[in-house]
């Protein structure tokens, strides 16, 4: 469970649910207001393998991350499972590869996701694991993996088309994830200020939602209220986490990053506020679940 970083699984589930929902409700052009649909628009027979398959891909990627990083961890993170002797490298390689393979099969065969996006996601995961310690731009691969997960989940079932609105929100999510890493990296270095662009990325979901409300100025009052409510929540999470990390207290950066990661669930709740309001509460509940699991298993 430590290898698989299970504390972040609620964010994977929320990504899958939100991507499926927005793509079901979106149209071929951005000007069109997304449809309002109920939860019965989501097929539970497809959602179960979607969530399980995505979970296995995420855990497989995290497991292989330890396999790729074993030399680095032996020097800098001796408490990790491999250098501490908790598990052998061969077993980690086998376990991670099996999780990736099984997860990809479930997504393609059972959840009926588009093979192109799932294959690209698997490739992206492996590239990130192999390069992130060697290349400072690896953070872009991390965001790219979230975008590819979003794209794959959007094609769950009979849908092969990914609509422009789905891509916009997927890119917003990807930049939010990039913003977490960039800001934390800057704050962790005493002589280096966090890039200002990272702050824009962290507030990206709220800003995109505000732009959408202006764009769809005839959106019904219920959805306008819900978007404003959830948008203020994710903006507050970003603002509070930034202040916490800049406070300089011991463990503040790790705590702030964990809160921002759990905030992915709130970002997804903001997305469905436009199209499937009944899904808001379940996605918001995944946020405290992620925070609770983080107390038992590290999120990073």
What are these regions (language model features)?
Residues 5, 9, 39-47, 51, ...:
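Hydrophobic, aromatic-rich alpha-helical transmembrane segments
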Residues 53-87, 91, 180-193, 293, ...:
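Acidic (Asp/Glu-rich) catalytic motifs at the cytosolic membrane interface
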Residues 2-3, 66, 82-92, 109-113, ...:
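Short, amphipathic, aromatic/basic-enriched membrane-interface segments that mark the entry/exit
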Residues 1, 147, 153-300:
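C-terminal membrane-associated helical module and adjoining short loops/tails
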Residues 1-17:
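N-terminal, positively charged, Ser/Thr/Ala/Gly-biased leader segments
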Residues 21, 109-110, 130-131, 155-156, ...:
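Helix-loop junctions at the membrane-solvent interface of multi-pass transporters
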Residues 12-68, 76, 100-105, 113-128, ...:
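Membrane-embedded alpha-helical segments that form the functional core of polytopic membrane enzymes
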Residues 48-55, 70-125, 143, 149-151, ...:
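Multi-pass membrane catalytic core of lipid/isoprenoid biosynthesis enzymes
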């Amino acid at each position: 469970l430590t290898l698989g970083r299970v504390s972040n699984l609620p964010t994977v589930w929320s990504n899958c649910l939100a991507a499926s929902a927005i793509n079901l409700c979106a149209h071929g052009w951005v000007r069109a207001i997304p449809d309002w649909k109920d939860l019965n628009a989501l097929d539970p027979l497809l959602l179960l393998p979607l969530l399980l398959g995505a979970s296995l891909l995420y855990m497989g990627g995290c497991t292989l991350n330890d396999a790729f990083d074993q030399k680095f961890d032996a020097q800098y993170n001796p408490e990790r499972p491999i250098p501490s002797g908790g598990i052998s490298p061969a077993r980690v390689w086998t376990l991670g590869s099996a999780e990736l393979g099984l997860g990809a099969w479930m997504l393609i065969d059972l959840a009926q996701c588009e093979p192109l996006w799932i294959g690209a996601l698997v490739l992206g995961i492996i590239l990130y694991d192999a390069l992130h310690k060697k290349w400072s731009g690896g953070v872009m691969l991390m965001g790219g993996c979230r975008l590819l997960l979003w794209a794959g989940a959007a094609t769950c079932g009979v849908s092969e088309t990914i609509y422009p609105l789905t891509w916009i929100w997927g890119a917003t999510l990807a930049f939010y994830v990039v913003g977490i890493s960039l800001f934390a990296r800057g704050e962790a270095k005493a002589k280096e200020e966090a890039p200002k662009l990272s702050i824009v990325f962290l507030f990206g979901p709220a800003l995109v939602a505000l732009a959408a409300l202006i764009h769809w100025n005839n959106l019904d009052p219920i959805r306008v209220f819900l978007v404003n409510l959830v948008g203020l929540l994710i903006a507050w999470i970003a603002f509070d986490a930034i202040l916490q990390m800049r406070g300089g207290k011991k463990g503040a950066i790790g705590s702030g990053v964990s809160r921002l990661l759990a905030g992915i669930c709130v970002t997804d709740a903001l997305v469905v506020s436009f199209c499937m309001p009944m899904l808001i509460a379940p996605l918001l509940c995944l946020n405290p679940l992620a925070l609770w699991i983080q107390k038992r298993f590290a999120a990073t």
